[in-house]
Amino acid sequence: MAELKNDRYLRALLKQPVDRTPVWMMRQAGRYLPEYKATRAEAGDFMSLCKNQDLACEVTLQPLRRYDLDAAILFSDILTVPDAMGLGLYFETGEGPRFERPTDTIDSIKKLCIPDPEDELGYVMRAVSTIRRELKGEVPLIGFSGSPWTLATYMVEGGSSKTFEKIKKMAYEEPATLHMLLDKLADSVILYLNAQVANGAQSLMIFDSWGGALSHHAYREFSLRYMQKIVDGLTRHADGRQVPVTLFTKGGGLWLESMAETGCDALGLDWTVDIGDARRRVGNKVALQGNMDPSVLYASPERIHQEVEQILSSYGEGTGHVFNLGHGIHQHVNPEHAGSFINSVHELSGKYHK
């Protein structure tokens, strides 16, 4: 593997000194870029794009050709794991992901097999190794997975949901059944993420997109417990370096202290959290990633500049901050505004690292 030329992102996650705040964007390879749309059209559909290692590599690299980013993130989808379990993932126009065979009974959960990451998910591993090779050491590669709770919401509901009625009903009426599913998913995610590291991922992120839908006690029981299990089971060193782990619960501002106790290296923050307050609460234990509202990118470059300065100022001096959006970039954002955001972070952050 090529020697890493820019390790700013990895150093910030490990709270080591950096010259400026590193920056990347969730969904930085995505529909806001015309070149992404062209490659997706070439692939035919979303999952065909994910399953073609060369095209997945191409879209991963596209934002790095445009912007001065400090990390690349594997182009894939959190639902690759349940798809590999045989649920029959497909996408309905305007409705998002759906499963042909939801896992909403104890019998269906018992039948689930833990997928072999080098077999059923081999296309992801081939993409990881291809991307790592093609990056040529320019920036680190982030691997990722959905959290067990978030994956389970799609599996039990049969797709996207606004109310999570089916899975919450299961949580309160048949908690042992849900725990069986979450335990299988945690085991699957551990294997999946460790295989990503073995194939070249240099940092890992767990997306708990729907943890914020849970009550205080339910979050600990059904989400955090299984992210803890994953953190405990992950490969944390590869290529002579530590492999940092970031946990991100959207809507998880109430639970930062509990998340920081898991032994992860960093926490992702959504835009509802004040990053300065978060640093006071948990900054002695973990680095922080975030957390500009993605909608700010609809504003003028001048306003984007102001918002970046406000977040940098709130975090304050020193390392331990990876700048990002508070969630994925919106598909209708002007790509030039994304560039203004990234340039603003690099231009403004140097004074906080002297």
From Swiss-Prot:
Q: Which NCBIfam families match?
A: hemE (TIGR01464)
The protein here is known as Uroporphyrinogen decarboxylase
Which Pfam family is one of this chain's hits? URO-D
- Please give the subunit comment from the record: Homodimer.
Q: Write the record's keywords in alphabetical order, separated by commas.
A: Cytoplasm, Decarboxylase, Lyase, Porphyrin biosynthesis
- Say which enzyme class the record assigns: lyase
One GO cellular component term, please give it.
cytosol
- Which pathway does the database say it acts in? Porphyrin-containing compound metabolism; protoporphyrin-IX biosynthesis; coproporphyrinogen-III from 5-aminolevulinate: step 4/4
Q: What is its EC number?
A: 4.1.1.37
Q: Report the GO molecular function annotations.
A: uroporphyrinogen decarboxylase activity
What does this protein do, in the record's words? Catalyzes the decarboxylation of four acetate groups of uroporphyrinogen-III to yield coproporphyrinogen-III.
- GO biological process per UniProt: protoporphyrinogen IX biosynthetic process from glutamate
Gene transcribed to yield this protein: hemE
**Magnesium: is it a keyword of this entry?**
no
Q: Which compartment or compartments is the protein found in?
A: Cytoplasm
Residues that bind substrate, according to the entry?
A: R27, Q28, A29, G30, R31, D77, Y154, S209, H327
What family does this chain come from, according to its entry? Belongs to the uroporphyrinogen decarboxylase family.
TM region(s), chain numbering: none
